[in-house]
Amino acid sequence: MRITKIAPAQSFEREFDGIATDKSISHRAAIFALLSSAPCEVEGYLMGEDTLHTLHIARELGLGIEQKGSVLRLIPPRNGICEPHKVLDCGNAGTGMRLFAGLLSGVKGHFVLTGDEYLNARPMKRITEPLSAIGACINGRENNAYAPLSIVGAQLQTFDYKSTIASAQVKSAMILAGLQTAGQSRFYEPLLSRNHTENMLRGMGVHIQERECEDGGYEVVFEGLKETNKQLEAFKFQVPADPSSAFYFAVAACVLGAKVKLKNVLLNKTRIEAFKILESMGAKVAYHHLSSLYEEVGDIEVQGGSLKAVRVDSRIAWLIDEIPALSICFALAKGKSEVYNAKELRVKESDRIRATITNLRVMGIRCEEFDDGFSVYGGELKRARVSSFGDHRIAMSFAIAQLACGGEIEDSECIDVSFPHFLTLLSQITAVENANES
């Protein structure tokens, strides 16, 4: 087990130009290239454990991969997706498993998707039920509730599906399944979730529309590719920095009263809600738009300062990955901060509500836990040894917390899932030391 020791840090002013590239877009680049009519090029594909598992699975399914420096050339299989000779290991990647499940449900062949102990404990009925309803032959443990998932490609039907949760993974799985039908399909969700799938597929030539509904929900309407026997157009783009990864250094600015400039960050509105929360707490945040191809990209400047408590209970899907890091700001804010409607946190890589509250208490902060959230009373962070709970976002969030007081993080290897050079960047702010314990 790796133990990471973090030393207390001083205020600073710094640009960060090496933030990990976006995990969501990297996953989709590898998967969507399988459907392309010609080779695709992607610069800056995230070389984290999650996205490498997705890339390896795409290779097993027939994707050719050539690398030159930071550019990957992704060559689609000449005769369509291949049936693999082995079980497809998604590692810790819930996005990879759920998107591949949607894609492979309509592909001829037999496919088995598995993951590590954490992924195989995460809920899968949210995709197995709607996919089965449109003709997919998909089976999993405990009445299709958990992976491993066994999929036999079938003839899928168009659909008009109303989801009860806002989940980009569920939506994307259904869209990938629906692309393999002849006709129009509709997917509804109660709040717009991350829409990278829609943006990228639109750029690849899919006729896909997003609309806000009268009840505040969103629907996606699109045409299956079998209607016109159409193949997707190739893509060529550079993956921007991941706003979820950049956010840790925004929190660092708030912890230390520092100023940071985060370079070339994805600015999709469904991904920067946590920065908006920092603004409402008293931090100064500025956005500088630089480019727009499939997605808006730009720089984000954050100036830390005195923070006030806040209540977070809406647009949770837009900041679900950042809530553990936000909790560090809550711990230093004046007053009582609250999070509600965030039950989804309990079924991520760890129970992130329980993990966050446990570690904050160890660091001397008064907290209360709810079924769907938690509250934090602002105070003073104290030096402590905390657990990552095997969750990369918990590990990085509390590494940032320890900038205020120093401390240690157990089982920090999980950081490599999404941000392999996080500790290298952190060492530009303070002393970081790794040690192994048996």
Curated annotation (Swiss-Prot):
Protein name: 3-phosphoshikimate 1-carboxyvinyltransferase
UniProt keywords, alphabetically: Amino-acid biosynthesis, Aromatic amino acid biosynthesis, Cytoplasm, Transferase
Localization in the cell: Cytoplasm
Record has Ribonucleoprotein as a keyword: no
Superkingdom: Bacteria
Active site residues according to the UniProt entry: 321 (proton acceptor)
GO cellular component: cytoplasm
Presence of keyword Cytoplasm: yes
Catalytic activity: 3-phosphoshikimate + phosphoenolpyruvate = 5-O-(1-carboxyvinyl)-3-phosphoshikimate + phosphate
A Gene Ontology BP annotation from the UniProt entry: aromatic amino acid family biosynthetic process
Molecular function as annotated in GO: 3-phosphoshikimate 1-carboxyvinyltransferase activity
Catalytic activity, EC: 2.5.1.19
Residues that coordinate or bind 3-phosphoshikimate: 23-24, 28, 167, 169, 321, 348
Pathway in which this enzyme or protein is active: Metabolic intermediate biosynthesis; chorismate biosynthesis; chorismate from D-erythrose 4-phosphate and phosphoenolpyruvate: step 6/7
Residues forming coiled coils: none
Top enzyme category: transferase
Sites where the protein binds phosphoenolpyruvate: 23, 94, 122, 169, 352, 393
Gene3D superfamilies assigned to the protein according to its UniProt record, in alphabetical order: Enolpyruvate transferase domain (3.65.10.10)
UniProt organism field: Helicobacter hepaticus (strain ATCC 51449 / 3B1)
Family designation: Belongs to the EPSP synthase family.
Function: Catalyzes the transfer of the enolpyruvyl moiety of phosphoenolpyruvate (PEP) to the 5-hydroxyl of shikimate-3-phosphate (S3P) to produce enolpyruvyl shikimate-3-phosphate and inorganic phosphate.
Quaternary context: Monomer.
Listed InterPro entries: Enolpyruvate_Tfrase_dom (IPR001986), Enolpyruvate_Tfrase_sf (IPR036968), EPSP_synthase (IPR006264), EPSP_synthase_CS (IPR023193), RNA3'P_cycl/enolpyr_Trfase_a/b (IPR013792)
